[in-house]
């Protein structure tokens, strides 16, 4: 049997493969790490894996939510342990392979220098990775797991245990009448809202940037400063101000602006269609300054030679706009425009702060202006439908990621980068 095979076989117990290769210090390190792992995390792994499979067996002793969280932590810790275990196996195999080829093994000093040179990036990024795992990955895994349980108001620890129900929650979204109708109504409005609001802010921002960028326009700095001022005001403050302006009872929109033109007051807050229109207009106001600023930078980077050549060829102003300006702007800004659509698809703040997703809709668990993310919030915080909210979150994430990836792949900027 070759050295590499013997070393790999012995490495089933961490460190023994290194001992076989006469790498004593490295063997002690791996043996210590293996023993310490089970000594420190043994109880966590035992309780965690029991909890994640059973979700508890006795009330009120077992809290299913805590057991699920502990089980997910146990899975994460196990992944780290398996990674170190793989390094142990690979190291023993590679050293055994060197012995089979009659090559000298690296000295302790050489191994130390190799670890310092090759492992430095991992050491530096280690704390960030740790924070990422427990601030991002852990909540994602926890939400993902909840979607496959029956966790709701009637199955809520510590009074009740929760159970694994597989894909039943996902099936309920499409088979239970109230959930199905609400889901498709909210999804339809979410798509309309995303397309309308994003298109408005992008179109307005690019249009104003083109106007202000004209060579014969005076006081450009003044106009640019005025147009980016809405971006300087915190978004939540602007939304609350607009909520007051559109208020049916005392808002300036009805009592001052519309009254000045002799128009009767409109139900901005109590009619779903008017509320939706107000939200789209508000997002156009909130979002156009950023697009205006980026578009201005793109326009200033377009070479004047292109316009001069077009003028010599007899191109009109609109021809220059169509064949030079807009293509250059859209190619450069395609990723930014896509992120604007993605952001608005999940734009919770404006929906919640304006009127809480209202007005209420008869026979629906969502309000007239609720988008998917605000509906998920209501299901969690008001209805205690935790598993349903988690399932909707998964569907929402898959939908947004799929659309965003498809859009990125269709853009010329993505193809040129590839």
UniProtKB/Swiss-Prot annotation:
CC terms in the record's Gene Ontology section: maltose transport complex
InterPro entries the UniProt entry points to: MetI-like (IPR000515), MetI-like_sf (IPR035906)
GO MF annotation terms: ABC-type maltose transporter activity
Induction of its expression: Repressed by the transcriptional regulator GanR and induced by galactobiose. Also repressed by glucose.
GO BP field: maltodextrin transmembrane transport
Membrane topology: Multi-pass membrane protein
PROSITE patterns: ABC_TM1 (PS50928)
Highest taxon in the source lineage: Bacteria
Membrane-spanning parts: 25-45, 65-85, 129-149, 191-211, 226-246, 279-299, 323-343, 357-379, 388-408
Primary localisation category: membrane
Listed SUPFAM superfamilies: MalF N-terminal region-like, MetI-like
Subunit field text: The complex is composed of two ATP-binding proteins (MsmX), two transmembrane proteins (GanP and GanQ) and a solute-binding protein (GanS).
Family (UniProt): Belongs to the binding-protein-dependent transport system permease family.
Function: Involved in galactan degradation. Part of the ABC transporter complex GanPQS involved in the uptake of galactooligosaccharides. Responsible for the translocation of the substrate across the membrane.
Protein name: Galactooligosaccharides transport system permease protein GanP
């Amino acid at each position: 049997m070759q050295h590499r095979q013997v070393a790999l076989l012995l490495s089933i117990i961490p460190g023994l493969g290194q001992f076989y290769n006469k790498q004593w210090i490295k063997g002690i390190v791996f043996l210590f790490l293996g023993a310490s792992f089970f000594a420190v995390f043994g109880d966590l792994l035992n309780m965690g894996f029991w909890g994640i499979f059973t979700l508890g067996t006795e009330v009120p002793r077992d809290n299913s939510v805590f057991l699920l969280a502990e089980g997910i932590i146990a899975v994460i810790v196990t992944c780290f342990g398996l990674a170190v275990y793989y390094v142990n196996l690979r190291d023993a195999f590679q050293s055994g392979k060197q012995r089979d080829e009659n090559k000298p093994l690296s000295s302790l000093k050489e191994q130390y220098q190799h670890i310092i040179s090759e492992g430095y990036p991992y050491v530096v990024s280690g704390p960030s990775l740790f924070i990422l795992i427990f601030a991002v990955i852990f909540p994602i895994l926890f939400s993902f797991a909840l979607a496959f349980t029956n966790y709701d108001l009637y199955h809520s620890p510590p009074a009740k245990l929760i159970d694994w129900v597989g894909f039943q929650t996902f099936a309920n979204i499409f088979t239970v009448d109230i959930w199905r109708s609400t889901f498709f109504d909210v999804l339809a409005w979410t798509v309309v809202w995303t397309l309308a609001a994003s298109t408005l802010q992008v179109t307005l921002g690019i249009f104003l940037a083109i106007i202000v960028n004209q060579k014969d326009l005076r006081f450009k700095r003044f106009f640019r400063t005025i147009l980016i001022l809405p971006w300087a005001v915190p978004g939540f403050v602007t939304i609350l101000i607009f909520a007051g302006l559109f208020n049916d009872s005392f808002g300036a929109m009805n009592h001052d602006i519309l009254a000045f033109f002799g128009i009767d007051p409109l139900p901005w807050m109590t009619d779903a269609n008017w509320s939706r229109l107000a939200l789209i207009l508000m997002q156009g106001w909130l979002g156009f300054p950023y697009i205006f600023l980026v578009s201005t930078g793109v326009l200033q980077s377009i070479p004047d030679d292109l316009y001069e050549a077009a003028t010599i060829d007899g191109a009109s102003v609109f021809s220059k706009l169509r064949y030079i300006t807009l293509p250059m702007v859209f190619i450069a800004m395609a990723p930014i425009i896509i992120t604007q659509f993605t952001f608005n698809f999940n734009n919770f703040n404006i929906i919640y702060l304006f009127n809480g997703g209202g007005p209420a809709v008869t026979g629906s668990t969502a309000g007239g202006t609720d988008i998917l993310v605000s509906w998920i919030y209501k299901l969690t915080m008001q209805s205690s439908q935790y598993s349903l909210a988690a399932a909707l979150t998964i569907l929402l994430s898959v939908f947004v990621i799929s659309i965003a990836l498809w859009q990125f792949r269709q853009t010329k900027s993505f193809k040129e980068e590839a």
